[in-house]
UniProtKB/Swiss-Prot annotation:
GO cellular component entries: cytoplasm
Species assigned in the record: Bacillus cereus (strain B4264)
Annotated binding of GTP, by residue: 165-172, 190-194, 212-215, 282-285, 310-312
An annotated Gene Ontology molecular function: magnesium ion binding
Ranges of residues in domain Obg: 1-158
Protein's name in the database: GTPase Obg
Cofactor(s) listed: Mg(2+)
A single BP term in Gene Ontology: ribosome biogenesis
Pfam families membership: DUF1967, GTP1_OBG, MMR_HSR1
Subunit structure: Monomer.
Task performed by this protein: An essential GTPase which binds GTP, GDP and possibly (p)ppGpp with moderate affinity, with high nucleotide exchange rates and a fairly low GTP hydrolysis rate. Plays a role in control of the cell cycle, stress response, ribosome biogenesis and in those bacteria that undergo differentiation, in morphogenesis control.
Protein family according to the UniProt entry: Belongs to the TRAFAC class OBG-HflX-like GTPase superfamily. OBG GTPase family.
Length: 428
């Protein structure tokens, strides 16, 4: 089964917790704090594997959670960083954040990697908090939570040439005679429901990859007839071969077919119209095809170059392949998305946390709810089993301006304040 879109959940590993410890050794009368830092949590890293062709594997495993870092230890020993979780994807995979729609990565070349969910940093041990006024701190941090998100994976086939046109115009037949591909061919519409790829050799030491894409119908750009799933695969192609049934046996006018398909390409993505398009008049071995071709030429004008062929008899196919190969040599690639500098095959896509530091809302029962990335991260990294850590958290809240903001919202002694699933009393 060809699977070209799937939703999965990824989570970077939490950082290891820092430790509260002290040196208790002979001849070390003032040993001091010796708690080590926690190790960094593992990242979730997507890596391109050229042997993969679909996203089928993700139908059976949709959750990817990286390991947390090792906890800090006594004698100042830091926890070990966890090994990154490598997730293999096929070439041509686009990764989007499900919530925001942001493009996280466009993975096209073998071995290319992208960090999709960062692991959290390790919490600091108490040796990090020693000062002249507090030489033996009872403070250690929990590990930072790893980033988590739902992502959408879309596979857009990597082909130099895309065959487009209405259903049953002969795209699959053409691919089968110019390559070793064996797409399903039958006398009914939408025989092809997934892209088929074939390597085409022109006979003069040139070759390219051609994709037979499922047939389009009017309204495809808006999703009619699974149009979005089909048009998605055209985006990476450099040359579009527009196949038209010149026999008219389906009862459609070839010129109207030509106009309709081009409108769909334009409406779906303006950049599709920037690609060179080769117009192929297929089924020229059928009755009335020559007459229909002349009428078609009169309507499109002389500026549109047309290649009359018969995919069944292979008439005109050789000239068509040479023209396509020439266009590929002179046409640059069309990048789909603007991503980070690709000079390095390893790309880091950072999690944007800029914006509102915290937000205060009030529930119907009068409870004040504090939310926001910074305050929630600080809360999770606080070890509430130690009084000194609790006092430090209170200072951090004041430093963020949360105390003042609560007072401004009318908070008084004894009011309930909630962060995540935890509640405590406000003390003025």
């Amino acid at each position: 089964m060809f699977v070209d879109q799937v939703k999965i959940y990824v989570k970077g590993g939490d950082g290891g917790n820092g430790m509260v410890a002290y040196r208790r050794e002979k001849y070390v009368p003032k040993g001091g704090p010796a708690g080590g830092d926690g190790g960094k949590g593992a990242d979730v890293v997507f890596v391109v594997e050229e042997g993969l062709r679909t996203l089928m594997d993700f139908r059976y495993q949709r959750h990817f959670k990286a390991d947390r870092g090792q906890h800090g230890m006594s004698k100042g020993q830091h926890g070990r960083k966890s090994e990154d979780l490598l997730v293999k994807v096929p070439p041509g995979t686009v990764v989007k954040d499900e919530k925001t729609g942001q493009i996280l990565a466009d993975l096209v070349t073998h071995g290319q990697t992208a960090v999709i969910a960062k692991g959290g940093r390790g919490g600091r041990g108490n040796s990090r908090f020693a000062t002249a006024t507090n030489p033996a701190p009872e403070i250690a941090e929990n590990g930072e939570p790893g980033q988590e998100r739902d992502v959408i994976l879309e596979l857009k086939v990597l082909a130099d040439v895309g065959l487009v046109g209405f259903p049953s115009v002969g795209k699959s037949t053409l691919l089968s005679v110019v390559s070793s591909a064996r797409p399903k061919i039958a006398e009914y519409h939408f025989t092809t429901i997934v892209p088929n790829l074939g390597v085409v050799e022109t006979g003069d030491n040139r070759s390219f990859v051609m994709a037979d894409l499922p047939g389009l119908i009017e309204g495809a750009h808006a999703g009619v007839g699974l149009g979005h799933q089909f048009l998605r695969h055209i985006e990476r192609t450099r040359v579009i071969v527009h196949v038209i049934d010149m026999s008219g046996l389906e009862g459609r006018d070839p010129y109207e077919d030509y106009v309709t398909i081009n409108n769909e390409l334009k409406e779906y993505n303006l950049r599709l119209t920037e690609r060179p398009q080769v117009v192929v008049a297929n089924k020229m071995d059928m009755p009335d095809a020559e007459e229909n071709l002349q009428a078609f030429k009169e309507k499109v004008g002389e500026e549109v170059k047309i290649f009359p062929i018969s995919a069944v008899t292979r008439q005109g196919v050789r000239d068509l392949l040479f023209e396509v190969a020439n266009l590929i040599e002179t046409t640059p690639e069309f990048p789909i998305h603007e991503v980070a500098d690709e000079s390095d095959t390893s790309v880091m896509y950072k999690f944007d946390t800029e914006g509102v530091k915290f937000e205060i809302t009030r529930e119907s029962d009068g409870t004040f709810v504090i939310s926001g990335y910074d305050i929630e991260k600080t809360f999770k990294m606080t070890d509430f089993s130690r009084d000194e850590s609790v006092r430090r958290f209170a200072r951090q809240m004041r430093g963020m301006g949360i105390d003042e903001a609560l007072r401004a919202r009318g908070a008084k002694d004894g009011d309930i304040v909630k962060i995540l699933e935890y509640e405590f009393e406000f003390i003025d």
